[in-house]
């Protein structure tokens, strides 16, 4: 604000990995005030515990509606998972009925042919969950970057000052 820059989105995104009795309080623990927060997120490395993900999503969605702020899962995933229905069972199912604008999976590390590192949080060709990912991808509830309109080409006859 001091330099007159106003094209930032300020987000708060606490770690929420388990089922908590005070989920709302945990989401608001470091809340700086409504005037400072544009986006409410949570990092949720819930593993295969869909109860934790569902519970935290429910509270996140309710808080989002109360505060009139968009919300989403800013980081999630299960390292080196081998669950065939991970995408529809552990990610998509808990999201159903929640007003969550985005879910971001943690990274997949590049592994050269001679490495045996299993550091991945998302699908890759040939993974046991690849077919399930394609099912999730095809559902009307999911939206991927390829589904979005071109937002980065300046419209004709528009001048930015």
Each model region followed by its residue ranges:
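Aromatic- and acid-rich polysaccharide-binding/catalytic face
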Residues: 26-51, 106
């Amino acid at each position: 604000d001091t330099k007159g820059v106003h094209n930032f989105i300020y987000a708060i995104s606490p770690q929420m990995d388990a089922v908590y009795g005070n989920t709302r309080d945990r989401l608001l623990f470091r809340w700086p005030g409504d005037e400072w927060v544009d986006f409410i997120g949570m990092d949720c490395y819930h593993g295969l515990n869909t109860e934790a993900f569902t519970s935290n999503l429910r509270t996140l969605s309710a808080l989002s509606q109360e505060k009139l702020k968009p919300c989403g899962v800013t980081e999630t995933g299960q390292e080196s998972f081998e669950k065939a229905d991970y995408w529809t069972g552990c990610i998509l199912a808990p999201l159903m009925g929640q007003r969550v604008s985005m879910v971001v999976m943690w990274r997949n590390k590049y592994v050269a042919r001679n490495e045996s590192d299993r550091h991945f949080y998302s699908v890759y060709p040939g993974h046991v969950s690849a077919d399930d990912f394609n099912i999730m991808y095809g559902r009307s509830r999911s939206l991927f970057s390829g589904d979005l309109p071109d937002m980065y080409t300046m419209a004709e006859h528009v001048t930015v000052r």
